[in-house]
């Protein structure tokens, strides 16, 4: 994967998280508290400055009251795993 492709992925996921957060009526501070993350971390993820791990996506999804596949449909196969734990 090229750096350009990696950045495009970070941008896409960041934009999706920001959109879902706003639709949920949450501030970055509220989401960060719910997800157990620093507000600056959420801000940088939304800006596409950080590559996110699956654990972070799971924490954000839980903070939003959603499953990981809502954030990134490519993770649809992993959503049932969270339900089992």
Where are the regions that the model predicts?
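Recognition helix of helix-turn-helix/homeodomain-like DNA-binding domains
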Residues: 36-51
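Short, charged recognition helix plus adjacent turn
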Residues: 70-85
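DNA major-groove recognition helix of helix-turn-helix/homeodomain DNA-binding modules
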Residues: 53-70
């Amino acid at each position: 994967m090229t750096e350009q492709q990696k950045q495009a992925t970070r941008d896409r996921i960041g934009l999706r998280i920001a959109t879902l957060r706003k639709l949920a009526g949450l501030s970055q501070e509220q989401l960060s508290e719910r997800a157990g993350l620093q507000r600056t971390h959420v801000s940088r993820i939304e800006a596409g400055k950080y590559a996110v791990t699956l654990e972070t996506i799971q924490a954000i999804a839980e903070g939003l009251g959603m499953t990981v596949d809502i954030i990134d449909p490519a993770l649809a196969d992993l959503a049932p795993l969270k339900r089992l734990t």
